[in-house]
Amino acid sequence: MASKTVLVLLLVSVLVSTFCTAKAYPASLEDNFDLDALDDLDDLDLEDFYDLEPADLVLLDMWASMLENSDFEDDFE
C-alpha cells in the first residue's frame, strides 16, 4: 500500500514539474526554438560580442565551462 502511495506521489510530482517547466519556458514548446544555439556561438568575432543578449552570454559561459571540465574531456577519450 505504501509503495502505491509513493508511486502516485512520484507521478503527480513529475506531472506538476512538467507543467511548471512548460509554463516557465514556453519557448521550448514552440516550433521555432533554436536547438543549435551553441553552434551559432561557435564562430563569433569581437564585433559580434556587442550584439549578444544575456541569454547568449549564459550559453557561451556554459559552453566554456563544459570545455574546461575534466569530466567532459574524459567522455571523448
Swiss-Prot record:
The keyword Transmembrane does not apply. GO terms for cellular component: extracellular region. Keywords: Secreted, Signal. Residues 1-24 form the signal peptide. Expressed by the venom gland. It is found in: Secreted. Its main location: secreted. Disulfide bonds: none annotated. Belongs to the non-disulfide-bridged peptide (NDBP) superfamily. Long chain multifunctional peptide (group 2) family. This is Anionic peptide 17.1. It comes from Lychas mucronatus (Chinese swimming scorpion).
